[in-house]
């Protein structure tokens, strides 16, 4: 009997059943895809780090060093399993050509290395240790995508009369420098080629790397190393930070997918409740008869839940199958940069997620039927099952209406009479608006020039970076003179960054990167407090303030070479660069050499940024000159491009889901209101009049749904994104998108939904359909 009932009910409500199944399928597909992507990301990162034998602690150093000092230190540390020093030749973009195309200026450093012997291997696209022959080079995947390179093409390195030509053998994966947030990329050369280039290009940087017996001791070892006088003129990273940086871009996609899943399952549950209530209203007398006949309440519930269990299982199975077929499209970035690491869990976990989705839907179905036990058989036969959903008498009298047309008045009265019913579809439209706008707002925020404030920098037109080297001071002075003579420059400021240590409340030492200069020239936005105004003051990034447990107004101790000095914390700002641990001050507390210098330039109105950039590129070599829009793009461009894809699919899903839910809702209204519409027809109302009444109700419903969804995006949305950005140093993200984004997209959704509603009503209440339905 149960099977016959389910089959008959599915056939009778075919369109509603199909709509619910599609909604459940999309939810299952995205939830399973997010789970699959999480498993693949975790497995691929682990495989990449294991295959490369990634170091547990790395100290970058720009300057000279004494290898014996490091050897002695390492031999005395019981934590250390192995160590190595990796020399890297830095070559400026002006000396590099990819085929016939010169390398473009940007934030990325081009570092040429030999393959390491013991650990920290550079890998091929099969995650195997990469080897190149003489005359060959392996190029980072980042540059493969940027310049659309192919195997066999040529990379040229030129300096004066010296020219080196290499054939591209492979594209490499680098466990340390894969992410775009890391502003250095390593190229692999044969030992002989590296030695030859080393004779021409003298500037080198070093990676001082350590493998530990216990990777969990990386933070403790970092503290020990940084308390010594060993080389540390550069950032330091630990294995957990490498893992986080590799997971950042795809982790953001996973977070967005999970948010979309939550929204879709909320929509599916609301739609399910709507469909179940409509079905119960239609069958209430049959339910009463079953109760009179003594059929147990549990059996009656099973009949109804059985139908939705079939839909849930069908939708979740279809969603899981779609995940197996199309799920990898979300993991393209993972496969390119880290490899395709499949395991049994790659298929099992998404299956379990689909099963859990089905269980949630079935459990919710039982919850909707709870009131069955409170209704007697007599009440059911008399229509008591859904009395709470019957129209309430609203004190609106037609004879008192003087201003509104009759059809608009009747539409509003119907809306107020069935507030619960219309509230459900309003919530669905609000969720669809939220689903559409969140990824779009995030994408526009990542594209905004103002996003530079989350990278620890003030707004400007141009940025010039000078790394530590033989002529850092001379180069800075030369560029400063150029700026002073340039009439097209409105404002400029030079900032110097050094590495020093700070004491936490537990008296442990932690490294921070202190930037000093005229902070008021290009001010930051502070979450708390203000920028430093005196030499005795300092401001901290969010992660530094949390790590050091410092608040605005508190004192902190800075340490270098055994010397200590006190500073007062005046402000806390957001920064996701250099591991998120930076600080700002007016002047350096200790006399020490700079790691790098940054010059920010604001041009006068009307001055062409591209032309001015070209002038500085030509005259300021070897400095890196970057348009700030390019700086943001090169730093987080890969993340923004993936968010753009997710935003497109989210908007598509929002429009499709809203359309599907409207179709289901109107189809249910047509069946529910057949008697009402017949009565209206008999007293002289035309089909056009009835359609106008429905359109009035839906204009209000869709407008409120779109409005509340937009308000939620602009109030709740930033908090959701800030929760994800807190671990990176951006704990208070705000939408930076143009104001039209919050208007154009919701209005488009509203117009499309209204047009769809009008078309569906015209179809549903066409003469032939209406005659068949009403008679």
Segments and roles (model prediction):
Residues 37, 41-48, 107, 115, ...:
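Peri-transmembrane interface segments
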Residues 317-352, 370, 692, 698, ...:
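Short helix-loop junctions at transmembrane helix boundaries
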Residues 1-29, 305, 391-433, 669-674, ...:
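N-terminal Sec/SRP start-transfer signal
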Residues 5, 11-13, 270-309, 660-700:
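Interfacial "coupling" helices/loops that link adjacent transmembrane helices in transporter permeases
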Residues 94-147, 452-458, 474-572:
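Short beta-strand boundary microenvironments
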Residues 12, 16-18, 26-54, 421-423, ...:
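Alpha-helical transmembrane segments
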Residues 46-97, 220, 455-516, 609-611:
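Membrane-proximal extracellular/periplasmic loop immediately following the first transmembrane helix
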Residues 55-62, 143-145, 176-188, 193-238, ...:
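A short beta-strand structural signal in non-transmembrane regions
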């Amino acid at each position: 009997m149960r099977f016959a009932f389910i089959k008959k009910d599915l056939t009778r409500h075919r369109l509603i059943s199909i709509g619910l199944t599609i909604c459940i399928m999309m939810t299952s597909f995205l939830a399973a895809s997010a789970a699959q992507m999480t498993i693949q990301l975790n497995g691929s990162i682990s495989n990449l780090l294991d295959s490369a034998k990634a170091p547990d602690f790395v100290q970058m150093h720009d300057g000279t060093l004494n290898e014996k000092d490091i050897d002695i230190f390492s031999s005395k540390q019981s934590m250390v399993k192995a160590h190595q020093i990796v020399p890297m030749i830095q070559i400026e973009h002006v000396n590099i050509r990819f085929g016939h195309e010169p390398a473009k200026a940007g934030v990325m450093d081009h570092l040429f290395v030999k393959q390491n012997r013991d650990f920290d291997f550079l890998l091929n696209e099969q995650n195997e240790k990469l080897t190149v022959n003489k005359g060959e080079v392996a190029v980072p995947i980042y540059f493969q995508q940027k310049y659309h390179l192919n195997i066999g093409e040529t990379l040229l390195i030129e300096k004066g009369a010296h020219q080196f030509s290499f054939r591209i053998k492979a594209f490499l994966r680098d466990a340390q420098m894969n992410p775009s947030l890391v502003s250095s990329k390593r190229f692999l050369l044969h030992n002989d080629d590296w030695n030859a280039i080393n004779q021409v290009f003298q500037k080198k940087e070093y990676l001082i790397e350590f493998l530990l017996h216990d990777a969990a001791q990386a933070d403790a070892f970092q503290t020990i190393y940084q308390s010594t006088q060993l080389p540390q003129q550069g950032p330091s990273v630990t294995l957990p930070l490498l893992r986080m940086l590799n997971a950042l871009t795809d982790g953001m996609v996973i977070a967005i997918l999970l948010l979309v899943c939550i929204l879709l399952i909320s929509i599916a549950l609301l739609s399910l409740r709507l469909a179940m209530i409509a079905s119960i209203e239609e069958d209430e007398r049959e339910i009463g008869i079953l109760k009179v006949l003594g059929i147990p309440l549990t059996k009656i519930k099973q009949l109804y839940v059985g139908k939705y269990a079939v839909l849930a299982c069908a939708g979740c199975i279809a969603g899981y199958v779609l995940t197996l077929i199309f799920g990898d499209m979300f993991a393209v970035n993972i496969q390119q940069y880290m490899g395709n690491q499949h395991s049994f869990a790659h298929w099992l976990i998404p299956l379990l997620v689909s099963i859990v989705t089905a269980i949630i839907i079935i459990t919710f179905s039982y919850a909707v039927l709870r009131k069955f036990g409170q209704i007697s058989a007599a009440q059911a036969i008399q229509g008591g099952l859904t009395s709470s959903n019957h129209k309430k008498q609203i004190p609106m009298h037609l004879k008192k209406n003087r201003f509104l047309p009759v059809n608009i008045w009747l539409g509003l009265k119907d809306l107020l009479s069935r507030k619960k019913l219309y509230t459900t579809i309003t919530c669905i439209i609000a969720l669809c608006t939220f689903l559409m706008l969140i990824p779009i707002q995030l994408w526009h925020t990542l594209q905004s020039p103002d996003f530079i404030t989350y990278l620890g920098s003030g707004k400007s037109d141009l940025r010039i970076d000078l790394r530590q080297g033989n002529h850092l001071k001379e180069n800075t002075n030369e560029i400063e003179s150029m700026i002073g003579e340039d009439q097209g420059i409105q404002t400029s400021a030079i900032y110097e960054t050094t590495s020093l240590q700070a004491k936490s409340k537990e008296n442990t030492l932690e490294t921070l990167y202190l930037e000093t200069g005229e902070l008021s020239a290009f001010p930051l936005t502070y979450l708390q407090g203000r920028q430093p105004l005196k030499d005795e003051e300092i401001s901290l990034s969010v992660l530094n303030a949390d790590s050091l447990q410092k608040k605005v107004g508190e004192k902190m101790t800075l340490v270098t070479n055994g010397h200590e000095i006190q500073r007062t914390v005046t402000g806390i700002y957001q920064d996701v660069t250099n591991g998120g641990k930076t600080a700002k001050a007016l002047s350096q507390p200790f006399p020490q050499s700079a790691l790098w210098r940054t010059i920010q330039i604001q041009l006068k109105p009307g001055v062409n940024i591209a032309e001015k950039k070209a002038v500085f590129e030509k005259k300021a070599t070897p400095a890196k000159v970057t348009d700030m829009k390019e700086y943001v793009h090169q730093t987080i461009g890969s993340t923004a491009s993936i968010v753009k894809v997710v935003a497109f699919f989210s908007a598509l899903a929002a429009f499709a889901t809203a359309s599907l839910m409207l179709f289901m809702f109107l189809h249910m209204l047509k069946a529910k209101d057949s008697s009402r519409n017949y009565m209206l027809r008999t007293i002289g109302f035309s089909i056009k009049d009835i359609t106008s009444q429905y359109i009035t109700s839906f204009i209000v419903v869709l407008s409120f749904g779109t409005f509340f969804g937009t308000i939620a995006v602009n109030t709740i949305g930033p908090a959701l994104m800030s929760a994800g950005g807190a671990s990176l140093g951006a704990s208070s993200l705000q939408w930076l998108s143009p104001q039209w984004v919050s208007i154009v997209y919701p209005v488009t959704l509203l117009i499309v939904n209204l047009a769809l509603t009008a078309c569906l009503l015209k179809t549903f209440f066409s003469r032939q359909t209406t005659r068949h339905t009403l008679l």
